[in-house]
Amino acid sequence: MADEAHFDVGDKMQNRPPRSRGDRGRGKGGGGGHGREVQVSKALSKLLRHQAANAGIQLDDEGYAPLDAVLVWGPLRSLKVTFDDIQSIVTSNDKQRFTLKPNTVKNPSLDTKSTTPADYLIRANQGHSIKLESAALLAPMTLEGGDVPERVLHGSFFYFWPRIVESGGLKPMSRNHIHCSTGTPEEGVVSGMRKDAELIIEIDVEASLKGGVKWWLSDNGVLLTEGDEQGVLSTKYFKLVTGRKVDVGVLWQDGQWISDLPAGLKISPPFGKGPRQGGGGGGGRGDRR
């Protein structure tokens, strides 16, 4: 887990707000400030979660990369991202998806007033497809530790539900983990569930822990699991499955099928996910996180 000398970062819920042509610059012309921040955080996510090796950037065991190397990566360099930009994301974003901390090699005094990128390391707190050891990146959640939340929820979509059932549960898909939250966006939870999720799958975490499934907690409060040895979080651990905004009745309860989705329900792939992105796990992300 991150040490005490660090900054937490959020990379806004990337709901992809409509973009005008004037939104592509460095915050000039077209009111692009917000749009540029989203561009920067998306680029950071892509690099630190998925593309570090391809970019020639070595992550340490905890998923950290040298900030100076990150800032010269092509997409970020083309955006002319500065240390101030990174620090702004660290201090002002709500999703807390990144952590920035002093580089103990180049900044042994752990000076957090430095504005030199080489003095810092940065990581994505979760959402990786790059293989990292969960124990180095995340805090374990155990029955013995008494830290199992009262509710653990996974957000999914009508489109994926039949495949979730057919495959026997949720899967990480292209990510290392299935992502869950302790509540919904309406309840003020900002990490762990997409704002457009249509289904709420409540997980019986205690039963799954007893069944040998490992659970983890990220620095930004996202609950994560790799599933069982086959990479599946079984439907037998589905405590309750209901619609989030549209009443579809109870689909699953206490590990048992109750009903199918209602006939005539409007079903379409969620934004940013389609037949190629879908699959048995319903995307594994549950947010956008």
Model-predicted segments: where are they?
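Eukaryotic, polar/proline-rich low-complexity intrinsically disordered regions
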Residues: M1-R289
